[in-house]
Amino acid sequence: MTGNENNLIWIDLEMTGLDPERDRIIEIATLVTDANLNILAEGPVIAVHQSDEQLGLMDDWNVRTHTGSGLVERVKASQYDDHAAELATIAFLQQWVPAGKSPICGNSVGQDRRFLFRYMPELEAYFHYRYLDVSTLKELARRWKPEILSGFKKQGTHQAMDDIRESVGELAYYREHFIQL
């Protein structure tokens, strides 16, 4: 399959923290939707191996969250380094979307893109330069139509694929209740 240039690539990363100069990617997941937000395919969910030393730099929130979800153990056992995870993700995306066509889609994807630029530059370059950031709509709704915010509840598992599915659902919710298309 050569892919459709109107398909959208959704991504979520879990990291050891928020600073790409110090912290590392520990999980990556992607999925592809069509332009109407129908999920076409889910990509690999990859725990990215990091050293015990790197994992030891996590703050309490990250230790609690990623240990509780089982991600820390998956990271320790993973055979994927940054580059292998990057290549596996690109191989999946090439089946669905031509390079340079899809904006990077998700929640707070500016943060994800900072980590991709540092640790997975080939994957970062696969995206169009634009962003489709659901958190922008959330912030606008909070200011302009706060009564709709309670209509969409996230589970908050902080597992990459769960978070992406929620982002797609959240955008569909805002499309109906905020943008009203």
From Swiss-Prot:
One of its GO terms (molecular function) is 3'-5'-RNA exonuclease activity. The active site is at Y129. Keywords: Cytoplasm, Exonuclease, Hydrolase, Nuclease. SUPFAM superfamilies: Ribonuclease H-like. CDD domains: Orn. Gene3D superfamilies: Ribonuclease H-like superfamily/Ribonuclease H (3.30.420.10). It is an enzyme of class 3 (hydrolase). InterPro entries: Exonuclease_RNaseT/DNA_pol3, Oligoribonuclease, RNaseH-like_sf, RNaseH_sf. Belongs to the oligoribonuclease family. 3'-to-5' exoribonuclease specific for small oligoribonucleotides. It comes from Serratia proteamaculans (strain 568). It comes from the Bacteria. One of its GO terms (cellular component) is cytoplasm. This is Oligoribonuclease. Its EC number is 3.1.15.-. The gene is orn.
